[in-house]
Amino acid sequence: MSKSILALALAAIVTPAFAADYQTNLGPMPLDDETRQVIGGRGEATVSSDGKTMTVKGSFQGLLSNATEAHIFASPAAGIPGKPIFDLDVTKSTSGTVSGNFKLNSAQAAALRAGKLYIQLNSEKAPEQYPWGPKGNLWGWLFPAHETVGQDVPQQDHWFIPQLDTPSS
């Protein structure tokens, strides 16, 4: 009995202070007349982080052309395009996986906790650049793990960013 209590106490001490899980639904980038014919698909990804590292695992399907690359971007705020900070491993197909393991500096860890990191997946036919930022195929902001709506639950549009309270940096 006392060994069990000691083991639990040690586990509590060595558990990272910022251990957390994050998730995103990957949906199409904003569509316009140019992109409507070449952008499509869906995906999801999860991130586990201890505040010093993060592990990304995800999948996608239904792209209209093969995936070419995927990145983690840092943005000034959720919903605003940013700059790539990490390259993800991605299956070069219309369906597959994204993954990666990364060391985080303090600014990147704070950005993750504040909902300022997102995943973007690019494909062969998706245009490369909008005037306001990089074009891609699918994207999704990483937020703390949360309930998601089912397929038959109405949403505002093709996808949306959930309104969650995120910790300040």
Where do the protein language model's features map onto the residues?
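Bacterial N-terminal signal peptides that target proteins for export
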Residues: M1-L6
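N-terminal signal peptide c-region/cleavage motif recognized by signal peptidases
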Residues: V14-P16
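N-terminal leader/targeting pre-sequences
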Residues: F18-S169
